[in-house]
């Protein structure tokens, strides 16, 4: 939001200015600055809906039961009642409870979600022949289509340019950025391998450790309450001094 223009220097021009560091080209980003004129305020907001582009196709409940029956016949020589989902041995006791009640889980429903993304930007600027200024604050809130993958960013930017006299100008730009990311995200691999009859949460509301009981495949959501939120803060400041030399068309500029 605070970028005014982007330009690319290539070949000899980049090497002449930046030396060996510019041998592969240089990208120059010009941030916005104040302009002469009356003080004015600008507010922009963007709202968007985000959802997973594509889900992974997995077996449905009936396909899962047929698979367990085939595995029971081929691997354990099961037959008759042993292959019955309710009285047999092809699924665990906890899965039988859900099977009897007709309760199934699409584990990707817990991993993925549809979210609203918000981006707010507020800026003001103004100035006169001697002084120009600009300041802005923006806030981005992106909950993330994967559970716990939320990202929040607050950006505060300010710049001021001062023309001291006909041959000297100075300026200062500052920026503060605060970023916050979510905690532990679900394990998608564990989600797509789970039984559709596996238990999602126990009677206390806690995530069930191993939904299939007989497998060491953990609940993909079991770690999402872990305190793994991360915060990053950056502060940047740079200034410049522009000196017009007593030679027509020649000036000296120092940035720091």
List the predicted regions and their residue ranges.
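N-terminal, post-signal-peptide soluble/periplasmic segments
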Residues: 10-99, 166-190
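Short coil turns and loop connectors of transmembrane beta-barrels in diderm outer membranes
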Residues: 37, 129-130, 166, 246-248
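Charge-patterned, long linear interaction tracts outside catalytic cores
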Residues: 228-232, 236-256
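Flexible loop and strand-edge segments within Gram-negative outer membrane beta-barrel domains
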Residues: 52, 99-138, 142-149, 155-234
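Extended, hydrophobic alpha-helical segments in both membrane/secreted and soluble proteins
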Residues: 3, 156-158, 254
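Transmembrane beta-strands of outer-membrane beta-barrel proteins
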Residues: 41-43, 133-135, 170-172, 250-254
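Short acidic/polar hinge/loop motifs at secondary-structure boundaries
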Residues: 1-10
């Amino acid at each position: 939001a605070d970028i005014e223009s982007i330009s690319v220097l290539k070949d000899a021009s980049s090497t002449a200015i930046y030396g060996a560091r510019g041998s592969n080209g240089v990208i120059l980003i010009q941030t916005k600055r104040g302009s002469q004129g009356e003080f004015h305020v600008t507010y922009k907001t963007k709202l968007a809906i985000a959802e997973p582009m594509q889900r992974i196709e997995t077996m449905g409940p009936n396909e899962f039961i047929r698979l367990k029956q085939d595995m029971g016949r081929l691997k354990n020589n099961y037959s008759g009642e042993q292959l019955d989902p309710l009285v047999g041995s092809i699924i665990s006791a906890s899965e039988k409870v859900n099977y009897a009640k007709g309760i199934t889980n699409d584990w990707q429903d817990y991993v993925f979600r549809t979210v609203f993304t918000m981006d707010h930007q507020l800026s003001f600027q103004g100035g006169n022949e001697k002084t120009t200024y600009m300041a802005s604050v923006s806030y981005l809130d992106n909950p993330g289509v994967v559970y716990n993958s939320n990202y929040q960013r607050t950006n505060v930017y300010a710049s001021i340019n001062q023309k001291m006299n006909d041959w000297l100008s100075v300026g200062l730009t500052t920026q503060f950025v605060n970023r916050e990311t979510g905690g532990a995200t679900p394990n998608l691999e564990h989600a797509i391998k789970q039984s559709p009859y596996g238990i999602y949460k126990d009677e206390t509301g806690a995530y069930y450790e191993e939904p299939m009981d007989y497998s060491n495949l953990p609940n993909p959501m079991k770690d999402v309450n872990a305190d793994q939120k991360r915060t990053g803060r950056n502060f940047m400041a740079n200034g410049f001094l522009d000196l017009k030399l007593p030679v027509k068309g020649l000036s000296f500029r120092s940035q720091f």
